[in-house]
Amino acid sequence: MTLKEAYSYAVTFLERNGVDESDFKALCVVCSILNIKNSEYDLHRNDFVPNKKLADMLWKLKDGQPLQYVLGKWDFCESEFYIGEGVLIPRPETEELVEKAIDYIKTLEKCTVYDLCAGSGCIGLSIAKKCKNAFVYL
């Protein structure tokens, strides 16, 4: 089925099964299968989407698995992080806090940051990427 057909099918499937934010989750799933950004959907509407992969991901969402675990990745502070079961899911609130920390750290001559045993490492890696004056331990 095409990306456009897969998206339509996914929205209907998720809505019928009571999954919240079915439009957004369907878009994320179908674009993830083709390894494209959500914003590139229109450019790939007629590309082929494997049915089995789509079905597997939709059933996981239906069963209540978080979208981030189903996708296996999530964006945080302009970078993509791999997310699996047992790893804390990066939240928008955390991203906002990290951006404030980055702004503060940039005002310092040097700084040491520890991001230990927190999951994906998205906090420490985001700080390391944007703050050359920080020594970050993961």
PLM features: what roles do these ranges have?
Residues C31-D103:
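Conserved AdoMet
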Residues E93-L138:
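Conserved SAM/SAH cofactor-binding pocket of Class I
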Residues G18, G72, E80, I127-A134:
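Ubiquitous "structural anchor" signal
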Residues Y7, A26-L27, L54, G64-L67, ...:
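A general structural signal for well-ordered alpha-helical segments in protein cores
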Residues M1-P50, L54:
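A short N-terminal interaction module
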